[in-house]
């Protein structure tokens, strides 16, 4: 089978498209014929040798084939499999169970996958497992979002951000999206009430006060946002630089203790089926749709991942694997 492989940390150029052996599922795994996958910021962080990646693989990536989001069809099942069967259309997030989605086939644990409804395509399903789920968990957080509350989303034009805008609007919030000028019209089209070009305006110097600030990119100190938080507002970090993440983990709780303002990092909960079912319901109701920047083949992954890391992608990049016997 064809797969994107990575044998060392580095820029996207270290990725190669190679012919490798098709995986054999273990007793608790199924073999999925991949129809679609999608890129996430986490893919680039792992490729670059981030802290979490180095813990798992100090000198090279622990998993040779990257890719977390997957949608496809089960073609083989292990002996312990009880729920899924051959022919089932499935999708899921493989972040915590070996990755491997950037390939024609992947072996995955049964509990990392759930049935794909006929109402959603393989391509659209492949955009949801990581970005939409993290966006949902960030927007809902520890405190329910109320109608009319003001939400600021930094990095609103990316994969996670575009889902967060739509989810916040579903809950009735007034949403302000922050991103580059080339993404602002798209943000308006998916429901953002206000947009800010971060290259022309500093959102932390605004006179607005936000009930929830969701930061998906974290290119600045989390404390810059304190000024624009409502008295009992909440700041949630869901992605970004290592410095900002460590700052949120170590110092955010101190701010939360000293005032009513709450600052911290969203503890990403992987493979929560209830979250995915809720996202599917929103999709079926027409309240949540993936913004797809482009659809690519496996061979185009290195270029697209470079564009993603440079902030050039609007929404999601979908990888179509090219199996022509199914849709």
Question: What is each of the regions a protein language model found here?
Answer:
Residues 204-212:
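A short acidic, Gly/Pro-enriched loop at the edge of an enzyme's catalytic core
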Residues 21-38, 51-97:
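Glycine-rich beta-strand-centered segment in the early N-terminal region that forms part
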Residues 60, 68, 76, 83, ...:
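NAD(P)H dinucleotide-binding glycine-rich loop of Rossmann-like/cofactor-binding domains
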Residues 125-197:
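Mid-domain Rossmann-like dinucleotide-binding core that forms the NAD(H)/NADP(H) cofactor-binding site
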């Amino acid at each position: 089978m064809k797969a994107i492989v990575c044998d060392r940390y580095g820029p996207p150029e270290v990725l190669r498209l190679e012919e490798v052996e098709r995986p054999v599922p273990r007793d608790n795994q199924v073999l999925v014929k991949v129809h679609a996958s999608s890129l996430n910021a986490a893919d680039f962080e792992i490729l670059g040798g981030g802290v979490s990646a180095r813990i798992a693989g100090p000198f090279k990536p622990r998993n040779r084939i990257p890719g977390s989001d997957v949608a496809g069809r089960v073609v083989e099942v292990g002996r312990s499999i009880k729920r899924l069967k051959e022919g089932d259309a499935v999708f899921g997030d493989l972040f915590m169970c070996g990755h491997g989605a950037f390939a024609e086939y992947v072996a995955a644990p049964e509990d990392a996958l759930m049935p794909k409804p006929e109402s959603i395509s393989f391509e659209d399903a492949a955009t949801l497992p990581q970005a939409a789920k993290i966006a949902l968990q960030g927007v809902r957080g520890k405190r329910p979002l109320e109608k009319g509350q003001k939400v600021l989303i930094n990095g609103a034009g990316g994969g996670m951000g575009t889902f967060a805008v739509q989810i916040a609007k579903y809950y009735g919030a007034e949403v302000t999206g922050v991103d580059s000028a080339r993404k602002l019209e798209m943000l308006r089209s998916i429901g953002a009430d206000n947009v800010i070009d971060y290259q022309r305006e500093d959102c932390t110097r605004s006179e607005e006060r936000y009930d929830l600030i969701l930061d998906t990119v974290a290119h600045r100190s989390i404390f810059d946002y304190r000024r624009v938080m409502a008295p009992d507002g909440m700041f949630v970090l869901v992605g970004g630089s290592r410095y900002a993440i460590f700052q949120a983990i170590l110092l955010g709780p101190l701010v939360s203790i000293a005032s009513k303002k709450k600052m911290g990092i969203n503890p990403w909960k992987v493979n929560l089926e209830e979250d995915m079912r809720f996202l599917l319901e929103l999709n079926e109701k027409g309240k949540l749709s993936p913004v797809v920047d482009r659809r690519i083949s496996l061979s185009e992954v290195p270029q697209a991942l470079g564009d993603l890391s440079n902030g050039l992608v609007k929404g999601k990049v979908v990888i179509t694997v090219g199996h022509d016997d199914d849709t």
